[in-house]
């Protein structure tokens, strides 16, 4: 819109005609006439000098246009090469999404970047280019915990870009199911929040599913209070997801102590309810305000500014090592004293860095638990492979959930 507005204003200036002699009246005639004593008019009363700023702008804009033209040519040339890569992948039976390759590209570009382009914008630009590249190789369908404007939807778009087909699902279970059936190539699900901890439903589903973790993404979470009207006085009911309520508990108690809090299955569903009901509001993202035509009554109402959710991309792909990877495991131990310690001991002895440990009931036997572990490194690394092999020998059950590039934007 800014570029369009700029073009419109320049065109409007070009359409304004110069005043006629009659319109200029005595000003123009006085400038052209000699003085009474016969002297020529002074330089200050003649035609204005050319605008040096305008000439410089024209020169700079011309240079920018040339660069834009070259960028367009280079991007199209890149996409032509991508099509050739896609043909080779298809012939070899390889998947379109190559998280290791994309991670290596990002790392290389970030290392080469000398500014003024910042890393966040660089990632955004090349995310869109890579999304267009994947779409040319093979149209991609990505499913997520919906509806539109959930934080999972935002995380999916930030990871995959705009050039894929997004398919919302009403539950995390449905996301797993659609990928398992093959109707969608990948799914995006939340797995943990920096404030509220693990998303247990996601962890539980990995126990039964054969899907792999193909990538991870950290998404900053910021909550807004949305309503049809922009006044706190009129709000009697607030809808939101339980985790969003928990993350905004202090603000809601302070500013809406008398409001009824009603849990919804997602923040986006809460926004939809607020749009349909008088006197209702929702705790949701600013993106939801645009989609459901709501007003942002208050922004950034979360109790803690450093609120981040980790999302996982699930699919069937085995991701190759990048050198900056993470491996996720799940295992079940025997129900005897010291069993967990013995299974984890190989990690300590190998010098690997364990970055997550979580437990969940197996639901197949009372007081039986499975454990989730994340370690730095890739299963193709000798140290990781040897450690996992030792852990498997000490467990009743062990499964590798996937090795994938570590996300850089925490």
Where on the chain are the PLM-derived regions?
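Domain-level signature for soluble enzymes in the chorismate/prephenate branch of the shikimate pathway
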Residues: 2-410
